[in-house]
């Protein structure tokens, strides 16, 4: 979990901007849950005003109200939970240029439930029309919620609602509450209704219909429902949004309480989820909510509310955002499976797995054995290494690898093997992605060094599905010990005696030469002190089979 995202962003060069309008417009009650849209460089925000002040007892909750830790403080003459919406235009520095209350009087009817008005409206422009779209619950006596699409007209005279449509749920329209659908900014009249698994609906304001157009079966292993939050925006070849999660419960005094969390979700063009962040809070409050996300020049702007009493814009520089979420939108993943993209992205771009203890430095000579589509090599380009050698045998991956690295690395389309030449089939215990049934070139590590006139390697990253034992063999020992400074990578024990014996041979002729190294299991347990326990290694190898890998970090 990312605790206090705002603090993390501020420490790395981002900024936060409060959204405040005159108190005579609000009578001093809450402002919250803003959304944001940019149209031809003009920045617009929908700011929710609630006719109450919410109180929530935080931390150890030593000071709850008589109504429990969470309560609403209303004006004496109106105890309903009433919402109004203001449209703000912002200056380039995110200060407020203008503020106008949305005039809804043309379409208002007497409410028949206690939650009144359009709640958590997202502002969007579709087909050259401006809309506020959120949930309304005041049209039935039991508070049935439905998303509404309210067209607004913005002029010098102000903001007016000119049409209002209550969107039916897809199918039988018999659900109780539909809310927090996330409008897809670049797809008019489309919403992400559910995230996990993903459901996308298309609404038709002319024929008054709503239908599901995407129904995915992919299910993330997350223990809370992923509910809607921000709008969905394009990000390179992907789409990204912010969801929210809630833990609701009743205390021992039968009072309602909750925790809110948020999460970044990235979809590909076919609505497969390729990456999600850890859950996070904005400023450590239990009650926070985000309705807005937009790309603005070199930044992302996130709008969020704090305890229904304050509204903010968080500005995140794109580079910081990519580091936090661990995903590079300019990186070409080719035809890699969605699940594998998520794994590689998290390991390399987010967790910096191979640089956990020793980092690539400016001027280093780096060798990336098992480069795949180039994620690790790509991730270190901004460190300005002197040279990168990226070795990848798969003919299927090589074009994508070249497109990612171009002339920034020496790309070698060969497999490290016990001999130099050509092979027609995959060796037992060695997996080359999507290369089965085709020829591939092989080269010994010794010949690789000789052909490329490599005198030293500052940083060796190796993950080549069993081929590591053809690097760390008897023949190469002297050169490796004398000329490689940092070694990091994955060693495969699999579940066969041969692989286990190869690992023990590596251990006995290499690890015994190093005094500064660490070994971790795939679930990040430090097992350095178990490496010379043969019974442990036997159980590890045969018990985990295809998960029987270890990560080793060596400082030579």
Where are the language model's segments positioned?
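Beta-propeller domains
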Residues: 1-328
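Phosphate/nucleotide-binding beta-alpha loop and adjacent structural elements of enzyme active sites
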Residues: 325-556
């Amino acid at each position: 979990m990312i605790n206090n995202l705002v603090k993390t962003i501020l420490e790395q060069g981002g900024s936060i901007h409060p959204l405040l309008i005159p108190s005579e417009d609000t009578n001093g009650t809450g402002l919250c849950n803003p959304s944001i849209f940019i149209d031809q460089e003009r920045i617009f925000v929908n700011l929710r005003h609630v006719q109450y002040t919410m109180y929530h007892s935080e931390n150890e909750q030593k000071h709850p109200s008589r109504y429990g830790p969470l309560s609403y403080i209303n004006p004496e003459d109106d105890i309903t939970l009433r919402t109004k919406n203001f449209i703000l235009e912002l200056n380039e520095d995110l200060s407020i240029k203008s503020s106008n209350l949305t005039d809804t009087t043309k379409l208002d009817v007497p409410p028949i439930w206690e939650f009144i008005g359009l709640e958590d409206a997202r502002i969007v422009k579709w087909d050259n029309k401006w809309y506020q779209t959120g949930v309304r619950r005041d049209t039935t006596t039991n508070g049935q919620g439905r998303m509404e699409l309210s067209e607004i007209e913005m002029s010098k005279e102000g903001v007016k609602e000119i049409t209002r449509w209550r969107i039916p749920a897809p199918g039988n329209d018999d659900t109780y509450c539909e809310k927090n659908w996330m409008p897809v900014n670049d797809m008019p009249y489309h919403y992400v209704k559910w995230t996990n698994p993903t459901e996308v609906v298309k609404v038709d304001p002319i024929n008054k219909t709503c239908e599901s157009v995407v129904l995915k079966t992919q299910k993330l292993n997350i223990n809370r429902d992923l509910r809607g939050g921000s709008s969905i925006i394009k990000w390179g070849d992907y789409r990204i949004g912010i969801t929210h999660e809630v833990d609701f419960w009743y205390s021992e005094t039968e009072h309602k309480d909750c925790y809110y969390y948020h999460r970044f979700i990235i979809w590909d063009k076919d609505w497969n989820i390729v990456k999600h962040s850890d859950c996070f809070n904005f400023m450590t409050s239990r009650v926070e909510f985000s309705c807005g996300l937009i790309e603005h020049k070199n930044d992302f702007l996130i709008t969020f509310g704090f305890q229904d009493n304050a509204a903010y814009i968080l500005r995140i520089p794109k580079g910081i955002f990519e580091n936090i979420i661990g995903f590079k939108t300019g990186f070409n993943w080719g035809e890699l499976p969605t699940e594998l993209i998520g794994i590689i992205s998290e390991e390399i771009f987010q967790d910096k797995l191979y640089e956990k203890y020793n980092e690539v430095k400016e001027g280093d000579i780096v060798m990336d054995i098992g480069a795949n589509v180039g994620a690790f090599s790509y991730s270190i380009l901004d460190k300005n290494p002197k040279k990168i050698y990226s070795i990848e045998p798969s003919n299927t991956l090589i074009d994508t690898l070249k497109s990612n690295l171009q002339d920034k690395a020496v790309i070698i389309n060969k497999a490290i093997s016990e001999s130099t030449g050509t092979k027609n089939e995959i060796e037992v215990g060695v997996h080359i992605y999507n290369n089965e049934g085709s020829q591939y070139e092989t080269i010994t590590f010794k010949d690789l060094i000789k052909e490329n006139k490599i005198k030293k390697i500052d940083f060796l990253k190796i993950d080549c599905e069993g081929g590591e034992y053809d690097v760390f063999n008897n023949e190469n020992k002297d050169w490796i010990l004398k000329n490689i400074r940092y070694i990091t990578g994955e060693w495969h024990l699999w579940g066969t005696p041969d692989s286990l014996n190869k690992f023990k041979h590596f251990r006995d002729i290499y690890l015994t030469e190093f005094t500064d190294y660490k070994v971790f299991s795939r679930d990040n347990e430090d097992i350095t002190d178990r490496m010379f326990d043969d019974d442990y290694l036997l159980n590890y190898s045969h018990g985990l089979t295809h998960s029987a890998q270890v990560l080793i970090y060596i400082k030579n």
